[in-house]
Amino acid sequence: MKQTTRPPAQYIVAPGTRFRLVANEYDKNKYGQCNYASYRTLVRCKQIRSKEELAKHGGRCEEHVEFSKTLENNHKKEVMRCHAENDSKMQRRRFDPWIASNEYISDDDDYLQAAQTVPQRLPDVANDDILDNNSLRYAEYYTDKDILNIKMDLVQKDIDDLIEFKELVTSQAQKEHELLGNDEEEDYPTDMAQRRIFKASTKYSRNDYLTLTTIDPVFHQCCVGPDMDDSLVIVHTMHSILDKIDNFEPIDSEKQCNKPALHLSKFCFDHIILDRSQKMFDVCNACGLTAIGGVDPKCSFHIKSSAIAETTSCPCNRCVQPGEHASPKDEKNSITCYLNSSDDDEPTLGNLSRIESMVSPMQQFSNQSNTLTAPLPRRYQGPPAQVLRPPQMGPPPGINQVPYQPKANRTPPMTSQQLHEQQKLKMQEEEMMSQTCASDFRVRPIDASQFGGGKKKQRLPPRRSPSFGTSPNSYQFHQQSQKKMPSIISTAYNSSPGKMNFQGWKNQSTSSATRPLPQPRFPVHAARSQQPKMIPLEQTQDSIEDDIGPSPMFQGPEPSRRGVPYYKNAYRRTELPSRHAQHSPLTPSTSTSSSQLLAPPKSPQPGTSSQTFRSQASRLPIAPHRAIAAGLNPADVGTRPAYRSQMAGQRPGMTPSAQQGSPQLISPPRQGSMMPVAMNQSPQAVRRQTPVPPYRLMGPQRVTTSYTVVRSGSSSSVAGPSRSSVASGSQHTALDTVQHDPRLANINVRTFLSIGNRDLSTLTQDEIDLLMAGNSPEKGGRKAGAPGAKESSKAAGGAQKGTSAASTSVPEPTKSSESSVDPQSDVSFSNPSPAPEVIEKVAPAAMTITSNKRKIDETLASESTSSEATLIHDTTSSSSAETVSGEPPAKKSSDVSAPVPSPEKEKEKIDRPKTPKSSTKRTTPTPSGRTPRAAAIAANQAISHSKPNVPSASTSSSAASTDQENPLDLLAELSVAAAAEEQQQAIGSTSKNGGSTKKTQRKSPSRSSIGKKRENSEEYEEEL
């Protein structure tokens, strides 16, 4: 930098002092301040340069121009480093790869660090040497205080560097320790080249690479034979001449050699001498067989003989004098026969694979008896080296799948039948071992011999294997099994967990008795047929009993619960009784799932295949809308209904048992359920029963069977049930049949309720189709019937829509005098007679469709008006009977069955105007504000058609006391009285006014707004 361009100093020494600096005043028109501002401190550079120089470098001084170039070079280095991490060709490393991988230090520049990994408590040391932080970089004079501050800053920087280096080394060691403890691949170092090295060396930390394998060689046939080329013929001729000179048997070339050639050669081990390019093999000096070359080449037989000859002077018992040697020709023939006798084992590898050709130092000084009588055992116990071939490709060509057997002590090969029998016996032994779980062969799980060092000391008992005629004794068989052991011993016998033992690499101190059975080279377990084990069932199962049904006790239905699916107890797999748990029929199964809702369970017994295993008491469910329409809880459909609570095994319609005197024990009803009716109580016990408060009615579940005592002469008998009870009981039976009839699965709800007590078993398929279509054969007859039938159909329709206000029931006929009943007399039950057609139409609509809320309201209303209903019934019984049927009471009392009304009376009823009467006395409305007019008229018509004997005055008091038990009977009597009173007032008003009913209706002052609303609602019901 030239002196002329150097700007004036920013600070100058104050006059008269040596160290005091004051601001220098300069010409701001000629000089200007550098525009560079530090990114970290946001402080502007205070260098002063001429404006011409600042304009050349973009308003910056020369120092910050060089600094910007340095930043640019650092950026380029960072880019190069990022590219180098993704490339395998990396340069020399400046730092250790472990330290470089933790993102604290870079291999290229230690100035660049990852900002997110820098320790937070240390200062940012990346910008310590920036020029704008050194305020004394251009000072010519320094005070002592400035020098001390500079030294202190340098010492503090060294301290910070040492602390940071300590933390870096600590974190590097921690990270290395964690990485070495984890085997997950994502925790490897991030450096690419180092990662490949680390990944390649990980296998050496385990024993995975210690596998005894060889490369699959390419097998070729030996070229010695009649098809040799000219060069081989010349070589063969020369060797034949030399063999004749040496008195050796020449090589026969008339037959083709079938032995495989050695690797990278065209000759087998016996003919490798013909290869002029090989240098490894030579001819034995003693016998002329192939031997490994050397100073004195000898075959394996002569190596052993020379070793024995050298130890003749040894006083050891193992060393004996060698026998007399035969001539070289006989010696060669004997050795050739010995070698050829064992060539069938491994024709693929030839004599080179015979480990016996290499003398073993352990067997070098063995005694003469073992040497001469039996060949020496192999050093490597097991099959030859494995071949790296996929198992689905099978063995290489030329390898037969005969199980490997060593040459020592060769026995005649076993036939296929003997092998099959041996394999069969082995399978039977395995089956017996697998089934004897409590035998002596089982080792308890908690045993010291199964863990740690105790497992190594454990010695398994010798397993007796079947021996055939091939082995003379058991010791010889164990010797064979010892020589047939594979190379890699199973971990269940000789190795610790997680490791493998290789017999060829360490001394085996275990005896032959502890070794497992010999395994074939290519196991045939894949051909075994997996037969299931037959375990006798009579050991684990008791006799299966039929599910007769729930016991007579606890017959009340379950309380109604909300939110329970309606198929709760249906389609369950009935649990078979066993010795562990005897499940009660009322106990629900705990293993019910949606996958088990498949079909009704069948009986597992073969003798009960014709009937369903599920008893008649536990029926299958019906659709939810039909159950709700029938007044049932969909969740309790599968359970036994309350109206069928009879003795176990008793069918509906059967006569009770002979034990009439003892009442049946019935559990108290649950809250929300109904008290079951005692079916086997005597009439006297029923008559003397104290009145109980009314229970909540559950639709068609309650059946009240009343018996009428008829006096005939001196004897008294109990008649059958009344027609109202018969109609209701038969209706329940019909509805229960429809619920489980598969032919009526898609029937309409309205048609389902209007069926009544019809016998569906006699209907044909066409009639059922008409019922399902809504065109019943009785529909046309009902339309042209009596007005009572028309009113009953309206009542049924209104009740189905929720507009009917009452659930009517036919009142029970009262009994005769108590004095006429003899308690000791026999009680006979007559067969139920069919009910009239009107009751058929009224009963389904009146008893099955009412809601629970209206039932409670009507029950309360009937209780409040029970006393008034008794008086009204006594005063108006004769007049109502005379008005409806047109016959005097005296004549009516003599008849047992009600006569059919005459056609004149029916016509008169049809012509009668249907306008409501303007009487001031009306029936007391229910709490819901509606009058049960339609239901009352329907009940009145039903009573008039089946009117029993008029009760006498003596029985009116007892009837009034017993009527309190059934609030529906009181409500029906009240409705009959109200209807009869309306008819009497209508007749009186007609005779007074003379047919001017319209004016009377208009001028009637008793018509209120409530009456108008009732009239409008009734007209709306008729329209619907």
From Swiss-Prot:
Task: Give the matching InterPro entries.
Answer: Potential_DNA-bd
This protein's UniProt keywords: Cell projection, Cytoplasm, Developmental protein, Nucleus
Give the subcellular location.
Answer: Nucleus; Cytoplasm; Cell projection, Axon
Q: Which organism is it from?
A: Caenorhabditis elegans
This chain belongs to the protein called Protein sumv-1
**UniProt key word tRNA processing:** no
Q: Where is this region: Disordered?
A: 447-486, 501-564, 577-617, 645-664, 710-739, 773-1024
Residue ranges under compositional bias (Low complexity)? 584-600, 710-730, 784-809, 859-870, 916-943, 952-962, 970-986
Q: What does this protein do?
A: Nuclear factor that influences the activity of genes involved in vulval development.
Stretches of Polar residues bias are at 467-486, 501-514, 528-542, 605-617, 810-832, 873-883, 987-998
